[in-house]
A protein has these predicted regions:
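A hydrophobic alpha-helix adjacent to the NAD(P)-binding/active-site core of NAD(P)-dependent oxidoreductases
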Residues: 49, 92, 100-101
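The beta1-alpha1 cofactor-binding region of Rossmann-like NAD(H)/NADP(H)-dependent oxidoreductases
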Residues: 52-62, 94-95
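Residue(s) in the substrate-gating loop at a strand-loop-helix junction
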Residues: 132
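A glycine-rich helix->loop->beta "capping" turn
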Residues: 66-79, 85
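Substrate-binding pocket helix/loop in short-chain dehydrogenase/reductase
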Residues: 88-89, 96-98
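Active-site helix of classical SDR
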Residues: 112, 148
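Conserved glycine-rich cofactor-binding loop
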Residues: 11-12
Length: 168
């Protein structure tokens, strides 16, 4: 039975390439993005296009339920969705700063919460959170972006420790 992978932010760039690579390796791949029209090329080669907005809990919940219904399992989660918004901390509206965290941190965290129970039940699984060198270094005019990526690094490290007893 092929392994099943979910890749968020798969409409372009790294997410698209990760989806293509996993598909070539024989995985059943669900490529997720807000706009599935941007996933049409992936669908033509057999990758499942999945509409998912990582700022919308219902969207994420229904996406995971669809994968489980269709395949019975989820083996790999690649949390790749994210973006950078730049400017002086004092100039970025708080709504924009919150949105940066919704996309880069809270969506990633919610997907982990949704898939981890399935992975624990099947006693296997891999979660990869795509971060950035911006999670290790900070530059002026990137405070909100860097803060979100530092949060991804911290969550990933905590998740590694929390799941250590379940790894083989």
């Amino acid at each position: 039975m092929p392994k099943t992978a979910l890749v968020t932010g798969a409409s372009s760039g790294m997410g698209e390439e990760i989806a293509r690579t996993l598909h070539k390796l024989g995985y059943t791949v669900y490529a997720a993005a807000r706009r599935t029209d941007r996933l049409e090329q992936l669908a033509t080669i057999g990758i499942h296009a999945l509409t998912m907005d990582v700022t919308d809990n219902e969207s994420m919940t229904s996406g995971i339920e669809k994968i489980i219904t269709e395949t019975g399992h989820i083996d790999v989660l690649i949390n790749n969705a994210g973006y950078g918004s730049y400017g002086a901390i004092e100039d970025i509206p708080m709504d924009e700063a919150r949105h940066q965290f919704e996309v880069n941190v809270f969506g990633l965290a919610r997907l982990i919460q949704l898939v981890l129970p399935y992975m624990r039940a099947q006693r296997s699984g891999t979660i990869i959170n795509i971060s950035s060198v911006g999670g290790r270094l900070t530059n002026p005019l990137g405070g909100w972006y860097h803060a979100s990526k530092h949060a991804v690094e911290a969550l990933s490290d905590a998740l590694r420790m929390e799941t250590a007893p379940f790894r083989h």
